[in-house]
Amino acid sequence: MARMRHFLKRCPAVLLSAALLAAAVGTAAAADTPAPTLGIYTTGDMGGRLYREDPVTGEAVEYSYQNVASAMEAERASVDAALLLDSGDAVDNGLVQDGGAAEALALRAIGYDALVPAVGEFRLGPEARDDFFAALGEASEDGAPVRVLSGNYLDEDTQSPEEDAYEVFTVELGRRAVRIGVLGLGAMEA
């Protein structure tokens, strides 16, 4: 009987050791498999810089939507899922501008997921701004729609947001659906 008690005392220790060993082996095997990666990228204050080269001066433009397009092509190839966001001031407010039509086309073609408008978009004036937001939301062969998120762009009469304040994006990461909340609160004054 004493031998049986001695055996029963050792049995849980042996089982626990076996379980820990199995967990360590499983963890080592899982470590060989790289974890899925999510990239969240943002741009801001692009000011209508569409091209790599200034069309007037011929000088190289360091930060432009063409550079973003090239960089995002490489980044999307290196991660399992990506979100691309713009924090506003995307449009050119110079003397020669088209109300943001070219910028809307660029944002859609590059594959931006959302834009949070800032001062630059509001300097367009109400009609051009609304046209810019509508152009972002168009689905066409020129690219996917871009969500406009702005919880602090309020209707003057109702004081309710003109655009959605937030969006919950769902991306596939490995075998899991991951949800990412993006809240749109942009700078409304310079």
Task: Tell me what each language-model feature is.
Residues R3-L15:
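Bacterial N-terminal signal peptides that target proteins for export
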Residues V14-A23:
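Bacterial N-terminal signal peptides
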Residues A31-A190:
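Acidic, metal/ion-coordinating pockets
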Residues K9, A22-T33:
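Intrinsically disordered, low-complexity Ser/Thr/Pro-rich tracts
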